[in-house]
Amino acid sequence: MTLNVEVCWISNEKERGLKALKDFVPEEEIFIEDPIVSCQFLYNRQYFPGCSYCMKSLEEPENMLQRLSGCSEVPNLPFIYDYKEKYPQGDVYTNENGLEVYCSQECKDKAYKEFQNLLDVDGRDPEHPLLKLEELWKSFHYPPESATPILIARIIAIIRNKLDQGVSAEEAMAPFLSFKNDKKNQEIGIIQKFLDEKFETRIKEVHQLIVDALYDPRIPELFTMSTFQVLLCTICLNAQGIGTSNFENYSRFIRNLPDSSIKETALDYLDQFNDGIEEESGMFTHLEGSGLYALHKHINHSCEPNAQIRFPFNNNKVQVIALKPIKKGEEITISYIDLDDDCDCDECEEYEEFEEAGCSSSNANNEEEAREEEGEGEEIPGEDRRSYLREYYLFECHCSKCQREIEEYNKTHKKN
């Protein structure tokens, strides 16, 4: 596949970024990418059945809508049979203990080849380190969730399997240590911001359980506290929030119906469930997790982004879409935070609903909490926005919007 972007040096401040190799028009796909590793959040998987590998939402659309809206009966969704014919769920596969579910034999095979062969546990043994790890994590990291320790377990398992294939330790670890993560980012403080203050007192317990479950004497450096903190910071600062929903996929199918009158009637029918969903489920409407992406990781932030992240395939494959015209040679940028875009197209409305579910970025939940605490309105004031980026992403934003705001402030200040 020919790439439409290239990784290149942007500046000493930004370091590497992505530049367009062609012109793009609004709503044009720039690229799509599978994660190098991903995982569903722990509490979330108790309520949203999904593929343990690709995070495909496995709940039938009508059942999902009934549960999310609190309906007493299963809704009779229009064109549901046409949808299922186009997007068949297929057979579901599990591992021997039944704790992991896969949407296909292909996903199951990939999972076991990459990491699951080292992560299977006896579900009847509550003392297994990985099961204890899950319970410990859930004891202090409550919904809305922003991370999971199983992502680190999968990373370690992937590295160990690479060693078994004859790959050197340095080469096996390289993909996970190449994310932006300098010395100041490795401080425990940034981990606390993304997770919970209680985490500081539990970090040794979490680390020890991972060591107990997965230690490999061939790579002792992978199991030090220092490396553990680096991996945690990598996830906190670089992981992309993922959200999938079979009902959302069905809704997208309805919006793409060719007959406008039939489409509007179907959408009107679905609209009647909105209040029920808000009352019954609030922000918890998607299968949620996070993942690390090899190309996506190079996309820098702008408060006036020219691109946007979406998940339109009902799995963990990320899609990067142009929001405005992009010229060849121009840097591709996204917003790391919710900027309350005023675009009202169907796709952006759907994306905004997804953001409200706490899935748009690895720390979307922290952002919402911070805004509530500060009593902010719909639009983040310029200085508050920059302060948030400094605090949670450890950089000073100098995008065109920030520079404009600072210049306008300076002019006003001088006049006064």
Labelled PLM ranges:
Residues 1-38:
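N-terminal alpha-helical interaction blocks
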Residues 3-8, 34-35, 228, 233, ...:
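Residue-level marker of intrinsically disordered, low-complexity segments enriched
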Residues 3-4, 87, 279, 379:
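General secondary-structure edge motif
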Residues 9-11, 32-34, 296, 300-303, ...:
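Pocket-edge structural micro-motifs
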Residues 19, 36-171, 175, 303-416:
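C-terminal SET catalytic tail plus cysteine-rich post-SET Zn-binding segment of SAM-dependent SET-domain
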Residues 142, 146-310, 315, 349, ...:
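Catalytic cores of histone-lysine modification enzymes
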